[in-house]
Amino acid sequence: MTRPLATLPKAHLHLHFTGAMRHPTLVELAGERGIHLPEALAAAWPPRLSGTDERGWFRFQRLYDIARSVLTDEPAMFRLLRETAQDEKAEGSGWLEIQVDPSGYAGRFGGLTPTVELVLAAAHAASAATGVGIGVIIAANRTKHPLEARTLARLAGQYAGRGVIGFGLSNDERRGAARDFAAAFRIATRAGLLLTPHGGELAGPASVLS
């Protein structure tokens, strides 16, 4: 007996916060805020990108940063997670792990801790509305100093068991090897968090082993 794929139970184990945004939501929020979207975001969807070379990665990161800039207030953050949970439910997913780097939003929401609490509140509301369980992964930016990663790992540890389930590492892996952030991962390990660094995207299999 065959079953439609959408009805099969699933878990989505790694989804980036801004990257989860619906395209119509991105366009709508940008219009309301007077933010100009380049053609690659406004019309062509999904954008045609190559992440395997430096130029392609730079373009991807630029577009991602522009998309993130439309999330300027709490209602937008709540909306993003609510719509994401709705999409997950429609696809048969009962569990979502969503990754966010709080430093990308801290300037507009009053700091790292208020940003984490906002994301957790939005995740809780989205879960309650849809029945989809949501765990939050706090991620560090590998292009920044490892000390910043330690700060984020400690912050993530403070919310272990209260919605935060993991600690990650993202951005261009050619500019920051995972081993350089070992101290941050030790902090996260002591807090009982999952370790979910990106690897192998641009630097090959060796970066996964590191």
Task: Locate the predicted segments by residue.
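Metal-cofactor-binding active-site regions of metalloenzymes
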Residues: 1-193, 202-208
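Cytosolic ligand/metal-binding cores
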Residues: 199
